Design a protein with these regions (language model features):
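Catalytic cores of glycan-processing enzymes that make or break glycosidic bonds
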Residues: 1-259
């Protein structure tokens, strides 16, 4: 967004300088011009990140799938069982309660806890007044144990949502409905990514007469080949990566079909 405000001059000026010496240039990891992985500030890992731009899942959409307020909380807030922390705290039940009260709130009389609102990222867990490394490590693992992350305007699924406790608790019908919703969101995001790439790459390619080549190896998003073709950006064709990823066994593409 900041680069756009400056009319992408940071990139353009470098391409103009390079054009004095070269006839062709390579755009490394061109997929990042379509969408980039954004990580919440303060997170120590990329697990709770999302693509940017992205299409959020709204509360209303989750309610239409049959998830009420409490179940949406279950999907989006890490729930920690006392015994999970007790196991790394010498099986000290009362001592574990004392530690958890520092950064968590107990749900009624259940042996189940939610992080306090003051805990915004896993760095806050590492910085809290708990001495045990093992307790902190387990708490940060549980911090990432959620299907959804709440943001302004809705929620987004974490990349590993199918490995979470919340996902395992859903029945097959709920999993199917949620997967269908994500598929619809991905279709919309594909259009967002295409629009962004056409804007940014279009500005760069027309800034000089150099031939543009893109590093687009591996499995990519659906709109990528068309955008590169429309903007006359050459692809890198490496035999082991040039495959039909959508077909069974992902066969290699024949040399005659190379662009």
């Amino acid at each position: 967004k900041n680069l756009k405000k400056a009319d992408y001059s940071w990139w353009k000026n470098r391409l103009i300088s390079a054009s004095k010496y070269y006839d062709m240039y390579r755009i490394d990891h061109v997929l990042g011009f379509f969408r980039i992985w954004a990580i919440p500030y303060g997170e120590c890992t990329a697990v709770l990140g999302h693509t940017e731009p992205f299409q959020p899942i709204t509360k209303e959409e989750l309610e239409e799938l049959g998830f009420d307020k409490e179940r949406i909380r279950w999907l989006s807030k890490p729930h920690v069982e006392t015994r999970t922390i007790e196991e790394v705290n010498n099986f000290d039940y009362l001592g574990t309660h004392g530690l958890l009260h520092k950064i968590m709130d107990r749900i009624g009389d259940e042996e189940l806890w939610l992080f306090k609102d003051s805990i915004k990222t896993d760095q806050d867990i590492w910085d809290c007044d708990i001495e045990s490394y093992y307790v902190k490590e387990k708490l940060t693992q549980k911090w990432r144990d959620r299907m959804l992350v709440e943001v302004e305007g809705g929620y987004y699924p974490i990349w590993t949502y199918t490995k979470t406790t919340a996902w395992a608790s859903l029945n097959n019908a709920e999993k199917a409905l949620f997967s269908e919703l994500l598929a619809k969101k991905n279709e919309k995001m594909d259009k967002l990514w295409e629009k962004q790439a056409r804007t940014v790459l279009g500005e760069l390619t027309k800034s000089t007469k150099m031939i543009a080549c893109a590093e687009d190896l591996g499995a990519n998003i659906e709109c990528l080949p068309k955008v590169l073709g429309d903007l006359d950006i050459r692809s890198l064709c490496v035999v082991r990566w040039k495959r039909d990823w959508e077909k069974p066994a992902q066969p290699f593409v024949d040399f005659e079909d190379y662009p």
